[in-house]
UniProtKB/Swiss-Prot annotation:
Main location class: nucleus
UniProt KW keywords: mRNA processing, mRNA splicing, Nucleus, RNA-binding, RNA-mediated gene silencing
GO MF entries: RNA cap binding
Localization of this protein: Nucleus
Taxonomic lineage of the native organism: Eukaryota, Metazoa, Ecdysozoa, Arthropoda, Hexapoda
Keyword Endoplasmic reticulum in record: no
Protein's gene: Cbp20
Binding site for mRNA: Y10, Y33, R102, V103, D104, W105, D106, R113, Q114, Y115, G116, R117, Q123, V124
InterPro entries: NCBP2 (IPR027157), NCBP2_RRM (IPR034148), Nucleotide-bd_a/b_plait_sf (IPR012677), RBD_domain_sf (IPR035979), RRM_dom (IPR000504)
Family: Belongs to the RRM NCBP2 family.
Short name of any one Pfam family annotated for the protein: RRM_1
Name this polypeptide is given: Nuclear cap-binding protein subunit 2
Function: Component of the cap-binding complex (CBC), which binds co-transcriptionally to the 5' cap of pre-mRNAs and is involved in various processes such as pre-mRNA splicing and RNA-mediated gene silencing (RNAi). The CBC complex is involved in miRNA-mediated RNA interference via its interaction with Ars2 and is required for primary microRNAs (miRNAs) processing. Also involved in innate immunity via the short interfering RNAs (siRNAs) processing machinery by restricting the viral RNA production.
Length: 154
């Protein structure tokens, strides 16, 4: 494996199995995790970009677990490992919807993983963000709840 397709240090804490089983799955996987997407990026845009590296088997958009709206990540699965490696090499760090996207190996999509794991339904990283990011819903979710006016007592 060349340097650009090596495994990162990230490991899914919810993986069902040992650390060595997870690493074995990652080394043979044809599935990629794609992060730092705009909430407005479409499946079609992702397909257009990733299909430049090979035949995409499936794209699974990450969704807010309560609202069922896009929340800034997806999984892209190829039919063959070499094409996934090409995407790791050439797509990781490129711009999509004016955002630098991150691509990492994934052990393989399992139903339920398409939902954000944060308390408010989206990704954990978007809950604690203190900066304004229009492509990811504005301010962080927890900060937005603190500064939003309470409309229950009117």
């Amino acid at each position: 494996m060349s340097a650009s397709v090596e495994l990162s240090s990230y490991r899914d804490q919810h993986f069902k199995g040992s650390r060595s089983e997870q690493e074995r799955s990652l080394r043979g996987s044809c599935t990629l995790y794609v992060g730092n997407l705009s909430f407005y990026t479409t499946e079609e845009q992702i397909h257009e970009l990733f299909s430049r590296c090979g035949d995409v088997r499936v794209i699974v958009m990450g969704l807010d677990k309560y609202k069922k709206t896009p929340c800034g990540f997806c999984f892209v699965e190829y039919y063959v490992r070499a094409e996934a490696e090409a995407a790791m090499r050439f797509v990781n760090g490129t711009r999509l919807d004016d955002r630098l996207i991150r691509v990492d190996w994934d052990a393989g999509f399992i139903e339920g993983r398409q939902y954000g794991r944060g308390k408010t339904g989206g990704q954990v990283r978007d809950e604690y963000r203190t900066d304004y990011d229009a492509g990811r819903g504005g301010y962080g979710k927890l900060l937005s709840q603190k500064i939003a006016p309470n409309t229950d007592n009117r």
